[in-house]
């Protein structure tokens, strides 16, 4: 039997495994929350020939990459495996893994898998076209990203897998299973399947039964920060961790990211600026939006939920603009030894608020029930090169990202009654000082920017530490470990300018959506089933 190691005996560090959409990381932290070492590897998801929208998760290869990252992190930290007090895992949400009756993982898909568009449409017609509303009222999710249509797709197209299915989990749970041999899900990540009751934080089996699907494939539910099991001898040999090291239940990347940012109390608000931007508000009790515009997820803090709105491709749009139009600025930035975005922000800071009326049309506000966007474009350009140039367009894009965030926060306040009095801005976008100030000016809220801007792994490490008794609770530890880099106060004059810009943009965006509806332009993105 493997000997159990405890933090009081030898462990002075915690390991977080972070399975993102594009990469996997193993991150080691000390007991003060300082990052010590990281091992990282990119991974690619698999498009299946003749299956439009498919994006399968390569279980065998990706486990090898995870083990590689663990070994790399241990080597970089120059510590023995016995120094790791506990391990926990977090991941992109919506991704599911299916296991057979022997506990072998047999199929998985990534969060971006969109193969089940026909099944989404089929499910929406159930119960006199009310099934999706029933799913949303219970779980806070629509069918767009739910596991239900994916399972139905398997029943229709891969019955060999569907009939062998014994258990379903999320990617974070799969990583923990590969380490420990124990299967369970946590509410924060499993909540994104559309099968978890927000009130009970447990499965709602009747939703599967209503869809004509099996309800006997749901894993046990355990809360984030509780003991799942211990590193098995097999896993120890694969990844060089110490057999017997505790494996602690992790969770969804956004919720654990909020834990790492100290966003753990009711009404606290965060804007997470990455490839997608998420606007997250903590609610003290489960409640859903009557208009079904935003999703509601279980927080990792028991009893609390998070409203979450999503701005589509915000970070990706900025990267597209930089790469497509700013080759000169990239060269200059390289010579100066600075980031190209910093140079572009410096140029944009000389453009007045409002960007001379230029209106970017990219992501819409979130409309979860009928989720699609207008065709990408810039509206209200001029041919005056002094006013309409790269600096102006770059500033307009930063302003627009903040405007969409403000609109999404307004939607949340309208149905929940929870109004933010400040917000935390994290993720890659928060590195921009101009962008942070614009966000403050557009929302009218004080913006706090943390030192650790990518906090998901830290939140995961906090879960690991709480699970072995190093820290007393998730919320208390999240508040204790977060450190602040800077603060941005809103400028009242700029706020007034942006209020007018927001109203104009909302009106113009509706006209642009109508062009998509008429088949005249192509949407930036549409949810499956539309």
Swiss-Prot record:
InterPro entries linked: AI-2_kinase, ATPase_NBD, Carb_kinase_FGGY, FGGY_C, FGGY_Carb_Kinase, FGGY_N
Enzyme Commission (EC) number: 2.7.1.189
Main location: cytoplasm
Record field: catalytic activity: (S)-4,5-dihydroxypentane-2,3-dione + ATP = (2S)-2-hydroxy-3,4-dioxopentyl phosphate + ADP + H(+)
Origin: domain of life: Bacteria
Keyword Transferase: yes
Matches recorded under Gene3D superfamilies: 3.30.420.40
Subcellular location: Cytoplasm
One annotated GO biological process: carbohydrate metabolic process
Any one cellular-component term (Gene Ontology): cytoplasm
Alphabetic keyword roster: Cytoplasm, Kinase, Transferase
Keyword Transferase set for record: yes
Enzyme class: transferase
GO function terms (MF aspect): autoinducer-2 kinase activity
SUPFAM superfamilies on file: Actin-like ATPase domain
Stored Pfam families: FGGY_C (PF02782), FGGY_N (PF00370)
Family per record: Belongs to the FGGY kinase family.
Function: Catalyzes the phosphorylation of autoinducer-2 (AI-2) to phospho-AI-2, which subsequently inactivates the transcriptional regulator LsrR and leads to the transcription of the lsr operon. Phosphorylates the ring-open form of (S)-4,5-dihydroxypentane-2,3-dione (DPD), which is the precursor to all AI-2 signaling molecules, at the C5 position.
PANTHER family according to UniProt: AUTOINDUCER-2 KINASE, SUGAR KINASE
Name of the protein described by the UniProt record: Autoinducer-2 kinase
């Amino acid at each position: 039997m493997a000997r159990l190691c405890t933090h009081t005996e030898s462990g002075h560090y915690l390991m977080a495994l972070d399975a993102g959409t594009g990469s996997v990381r193993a991150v080691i932290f000390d007991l003060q929350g300082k990052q010590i070492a990281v091992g990282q590897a990119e991974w690619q998801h698999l498009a299946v020939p003749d299956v439009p929208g498919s994006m399968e998760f390569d279980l065998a290869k990706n486990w090898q990459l995870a083990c590689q990252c663990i070994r790399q992190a241990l080597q970089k930290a120059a510590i023995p495996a016995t120094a790791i007090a506990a391990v926990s895992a977090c991941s992109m949400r919506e991704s599911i893994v299916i296991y057979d009756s022997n506990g072998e993982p047999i199929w998985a898909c990534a969060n971006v898998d969109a193969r089940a568009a026909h099944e989404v449409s089929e499910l929406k017609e159930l119960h006199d076209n009310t099934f999706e509303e029933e799913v949303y009222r219970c779980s806070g999710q629509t069918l767009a990203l739910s596991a239900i249509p994916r399972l139905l797709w398997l029943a229709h197209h891969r019955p060999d897998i569907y009939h062998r299915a014994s258990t379903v989990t999320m990617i974070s749970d799969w990583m923990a299973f590969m380490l420990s041999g124990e299967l369970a899900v946590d509410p924060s990540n499993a909540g994104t399947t559309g099968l978890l009751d927000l009130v009970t934080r447990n499965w709602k089996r009747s939703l599967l039964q209503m869809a004509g699907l099996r309800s006997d494939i749901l894993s046990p539910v355990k809360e984030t920060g509780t003991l799942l099991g211990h590193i098995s001898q097999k896993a120890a040999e694969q990844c060089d961790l110490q057999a017997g090291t505790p494996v602690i239940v992790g969770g969804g990347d956004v919720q654990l990211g909020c834990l790492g940012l100290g966003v753990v109390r009711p009404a606290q608000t965060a804007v997470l600026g990455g490839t997608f931007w998420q606007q997250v508000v903590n609610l003290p009790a489960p409640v859903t939006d009557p208009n079904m515009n935003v999703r509601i997820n279980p927080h990792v803090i028991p009893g609390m939920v998070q409203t979450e709105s999503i701005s589509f491709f915000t970070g990706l749009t900025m990267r597209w603009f930089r790469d497509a139009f700013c080759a000169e600025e990239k060269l200059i930035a390289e010579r100066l030894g600075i980031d190209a975005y910093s140079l572009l922000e410096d140029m944009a800071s000389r453009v007045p608020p409002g960007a001379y009326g230029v209106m970017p049309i990219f992501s819409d506000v979130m409309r979860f029930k009928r989720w699609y966007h207008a065709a990408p474009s810039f509206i209200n350009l001029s041919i005056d090169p002094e006013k309409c140039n790269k600096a102006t367009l770059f500033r307009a894009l930063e302003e627009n990202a903040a405007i969409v965030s403000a609109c999404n926060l307004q939607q949340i306040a309208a149905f929940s009654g929870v109004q933010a009095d400040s917000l935390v801005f994290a993720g890659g976008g928060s590195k921009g000082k101009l962008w942070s100030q614009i966000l403050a000016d557009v929302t009218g809220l004080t913006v706090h920017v943390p030192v650790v801007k990518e906090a998901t792994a830290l939140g995961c490490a906090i879960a690991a530490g709480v699970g072995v008794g190093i820290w007393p609770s998730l919320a208390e530890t999240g508040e204790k470990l977060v450190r602040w880099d800077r603060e941005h106060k809103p400028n009242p004059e700029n706020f007034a300018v942006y209020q007018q810009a927001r109203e104009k943009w909302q009106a113009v965006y509706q006209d642009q959506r109508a062009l998509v509806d008429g088949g005249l332009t192509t949407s930036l993105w549409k949810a499956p089933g539309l």
